[in-house]
Amino acid sequence: MAKYEVNVERTNIEETRELLKIKKMNDFQNIGDLIPAGGSFVFNCERYAVLAIHQEINTSGDQDYRRLIVIDPDGNTYGTSSESAIDTFTELIMDLESYNIPLPQEMNAFKRKGKDTKGEGYILIGLE
C-alpha cells in the first residue's frame, strides 16, 4: 500500500480542526490557472499553510513536494505546488512578520519566464 504523509512546514492557523482539514485539502483553486496571460491574480491572504508532502508511489518511486494553501477572508481557498511561488510567498510572510505587519494582506501572483522554463514560466508572489 502506498504511503501518503503530510507535515506542516509553516502556518498561521492555530485551530487544530482547521489545520487538520487543510492537511487533507485537495479542493482548491489552482493559483497558476487563475493568472491571466501577461497579468496577475490578486488575492487577499488571511490564513495560510505550507505543507511538506511525501507520497510513496509504487510504480515511479517516492515523490516529495510542497503545497501552499491560502485562505481569503471569504473562505475561498487557493493553492499551488510551484516551488518558486512557495519560496517567494514564504519570504514575503517572513518580511511581514519581521515588520509586525498583520494579515490579511492583498497579494498578487504572476508568472515570469526563465532561462530553464519551457512554456508557463515561474510563478512568483508579491504584495499588491
Regions found by a protein language model. Give the residues of each.
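Generic N-terminal initiation segments characterized by hydrophobic and/or small/turn-forming residues
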Residues: 16-17, 89, 93, 124
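Compositionally biased, low-structure terminal segments
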Residues: 29, 42-44, 90, 100, ...
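OB-fold/S1-family single-stranded nucleic acid-binding modules
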Residues: 110-128
